[in-house]
Amino acid sequence: MSSGTLYDKVWDLHRVADLPGGSTQLFVGLHLIHEVTSPQAFSGLRDKGLKVACPERTVATVDHIVPTTSQARPFADPLAEEMLSTLERNCAESGIVLNGIGSGRQGIVHVIAPELGLSQPGMTVACGDSHTSTHGAFGAIAFGIGTSQVRDVLASQSLAMNKLKVRRILVNGQLSAGVSAKDLVLHVIRTLGVKGGVGYAYEFAGSAIEALSMEERMTLCNMAIEGGARCGYVNPDQTTFDYLKGRPHAPSGAAWDAAVDWWLSLATDAAAEVDDEVVFDATVIAPTVTWGITPGQGLGIDECVPSLSMLDPGERPIAKEAYRYMDLDPGTPIAGVPIDVCFIGSCTNGRLSDLRAAAAVARGRQVAKGVKAFVVPGSEQVARAAEAEGLDQVFSEAGFEWREPGCSMCLAMNPDRLEGRQISASSSNRNFKGRQGSASGRTLLMSPAMVVAAAVHGRVTDVRTLALHSAS
């Protein structure tokens, strides 16, 4: 095996051929598909008389379009029903496992693959979804692809790629109480910008990263793409192995021991050189909330909307647009901004640990009058585990709606949508204009615990001012 960074090693292990122009044909170890970006890809295969090359390396689920209130078939939305039926037919014809509704394994694609043990160190993972970088939390190289590339991977189990540079995001120290991985990644994106990572893979390292749980690492890598990086990863360690052991698709017995030895060898060598390194101090990071229309427009909870004079010249045009769209003036404290809708869920923050953190704030409190609040577990497994712990009751008693799994209001390709000029506190990953349904709806990104704090006060609130209530 070559020496160097994990990225270098995984790249070399999966190289099929060097192509003219400097790109490389890479073997794809795991291909994840869903109902939105796969129909045209399958049609493209049929048009060329091709079949799926490696159905055993292809895994499907339905997530983007599924309703979260009632998942009875047929869906009320005929387009959603058609998309799901098409996925079912394509998977059946191609011999692809579909983790469908009611299977006990359905959910957001970037939630179910890790919980099933499909995402493993040293893999290359591809999916027709921007947030495929999530799987880098395991020490994999994972990247989102477009529909035409989905077709190519279905046909050849490989993909033409240009090799990225590696930037180490070194985070020293420890996060303070009340500060989460979501706050950390929003802080990184705010600092480096939404285009700062273009051309890079982000290697997250340092004592603060090592202290994160696997689900927190998934949150971190999930949003690497929002900082412009094509992928983000964390070197595998004991935390990785403890998470994977015993999961359905993880190795077992002697194969487990051999896998762990190999996974450890993939980690970036101590003497390996990276192309760039940026150092952060975890101790100074506060709960972070976006104020604008990109994930890079973030603020610590004690800060105010910046004036143009505080911004670099290149940031000013988008800031002007954000002032108008968000109806927030320079100098407005982010704490205290009123909220209409509160959403907990998504591939960023819809896992069991996210729901536990949110429930600790919600327990014994009530959603403010006039605020609509709901919780959408990231998968059927997450939902059933949360219900077994009574978290659904905690949320329901606090005034949150408890829903069934799906992407929900992260992108509103389903009935969960903002209306008019509503403003949401959301644990999702994108705050683009119109992202959550309404063309004029507004989104403030924050951690699940911060969403609950906003819900109970009806405005953006520092969760650190609220006492946490553990289960009795």
Curated annotation (Swiss-Prot):
It is an enzyme of class 4 (lyase). One of its GO terms (biological process) is L-leucine biosynthetic process. Its EC number is 4.2.1.33. Keywords: 4Fe-4S, Amino-acid biosynthesis, Branched-chain amino acid biosynthesis, Iron, Iron-sulfur, Leucine biosynthesis, Lyase, Metal-binding. The keyword Nucleus does not apply. It catalyses: (2R,3S)-3-isopropylmalate = (2S)-2-isopropylmalate. [4Fe-4S] cluster binds at residues 347, 407, 410. PROSITE patterns: ACONITASE_1 (PS00450), ACONITASE_2 (PS01244). Binds 1 [4Fe-4S] cluster per subunit. Its cofactor is [4Fe-4S] cluster. CDD domains: IPMI. Pfam families: Aconitase (PF00330). One of its GO terms (molecular function) is 4 iron, 4 sulfur cluster binding. Pathway: Amino-acid biosynthesis; L-leucine biosynthesis; L-leucine from 3-methyl-2-oxobutanoate: step 2/4. Disulfide bonds: none annotated. Belongs to the aconitase/IPM isomerase family. LeuC type 1 subfamily. Catalyzes the isomerization between 2-isopropylmalate and 3-isopropylmalate, via the formation of 2-isopropylmaleate. Heterodimer of LeuC and LeuD. PANTHER family: 3-ISOPROPYLMALATE DEHYDRATASE (PTHR43822:SF9), HOMOACONITASE, MITOCHONDRIAL-RELATED (PTHR43822). This is 3-isopropylmalate dehydratase large subunit. It comes from Synechococcus sp. (strain CC9902). The lineage of its organism: Bacteria, Bacillati, Cyanobacteriota, Cyanophyceae, Synechococcales.
